[in-house]
From Swiss-Prot:
One cellular component term from this protein's GO annotations in UniProt: cytoplasm
InterPro entries xref list: Cyclin (IPR039361), Cyclin-like_dom (IPR013763), Cyclin-like_sf (IPR036915), Cyclin_C-dom (IPR004367), Cyclin_N (IPR006671), Cyclins_cyclin-box (IPR048258)
Organism: Mus musculus
Residue stretches making up the Cyclin N-terminal domain: 27-152
Gene: Ccnd3
SUPFAM superfamilies for this protein: Cyclin-like
Name recorded for this polypeptide: G1/S-specific cyclin-D3
Family: Belongs to the cyclin family. Cyclin D subfamily.
Length: 292
């Protein structure tokens, strides 16, 4: 007897883009007014934290990103979790032994807000190799919520992507690819503390600019595109250009690190043999697939 499994990949129901909502200037202006509320005011490594260092934050961020990729989370779950992490660390001194616990709680909260089916406590504990117990997650969930004043609906860079792309009027066959590359840049920025105090709109605008120029998705020059993007979000041209250059530099550094740690190449399969490609996820394109 043969059994056939017809179960497909889990897909969350999605609403189609609303041109009136995307084109309404009040929506963009509302996000621009609110974004500063969710940006850390100063470097917490200098003012608040004594044990935690920038490289520890980066290691935690990469682990959190891997969890999101494994669980095929929505692309805005990881940046939102990093926003919670930075806001908490900017006001509460934390021991380095508690850092993974804090990151796990932030993932739990972000998935509850942005996922159709949130990550479970049990599953997150497995990802920590049982270093975090379920009761710790529950206790710290309440603690983090209190320190964030229950204000979880943070404005992040991902919220600006659709609004900016709608105003760029790119060719329809390039929009999806530009958005996917921009999402990769946003995930990369979230792992780097250098961008933690940048306004989300500037990070989103710089990521889209880097993606458009890297893909050659429009006929405008780099200066013309930068001026157009700066006008959309009301950003100073020089600041936006510096942010975009910093994003591209972070990408080059990430590619260099990936090349150093890359495994040896796998021999090609004999001709005629079939191999199953990786399934599509809702997480961004891998950073090694980006070309400037």
């Amino acid at each position: 007897m043969e059994l056939l499994c017809c179960e497909g990949t889990r897909h969350a129901p999605r609403a189609g883009p609303d041109p009136r909502l995307l084109g309404d200037q009040r929506v963009l202006q509302s996000l621009l007014r609110l974004e500063e509320r969710y940006v850390p005011r100063a470097s917490y490594f200098q003012c608040v934290q004594k044990e935690i260092k920038p490289h520890m934050r980066k290691m935690l961020a990469y682990w959190m990103l891997e969890v999101c990729e494994e669980q095929r989370c929505e692309e805005d779950v990881f940046p939102l979790a990093m926003n919670y992490l930075d806001r908490y660390l900017s006001c509460v001194p934390t021991r380095k032994a508690q850092l993974q616990l804090l990151g796990t709680v932030c993932l739990l909260l972000a998935s509850k807000l942005r996922e159709t089916t949130p990550l479970t406590i049990e599953k997150l504990c497995i990802y920590t190799d049982q270093a975090v117990a379920p009761w710790q997650l529950r206790e710290w969930e309440v603690l983090v919520l209190g320190k964030l004043k229950w204000d979880l609906a943070a404005v992040i860079a991902h919220d600006f992507l659709a609004l900016i792309l709608h105003r760029l009027s790119l060719p329809s066959d390039r929009q999806a690819l530009v958005k996917k590359h921009a999402q990769t840049f946003l995930a990369l920025c979230a792992t780097d503390y250098t961008f933690a105090m940048y306004p989300p709109s500037m990070i989103a605008t710089g990521s889209i600019g880097a993606a458009v120029l890297g893909l050659g998705a429009c006929s405008m020059s780099a200066d013309e595109l930068t001026e157009l993007l700066a006008g959309i979000t009301g950003t100073e041209v020089d600041c936006l250009r510096a942010c975009q250059e910093q994003i591209e530099a972070a990408l080059r550094e990430s590619l260099r690190e990936a090349a150093q740690t890359a495994p040896s190449p796998v021999p090609k399969a004999p001709r005629g043999s079939s191999s199953q490609g990786p399934s599509q996820t809702s997480t961004p394109t891998d950073v090694t697939a980006i070309h400037l």
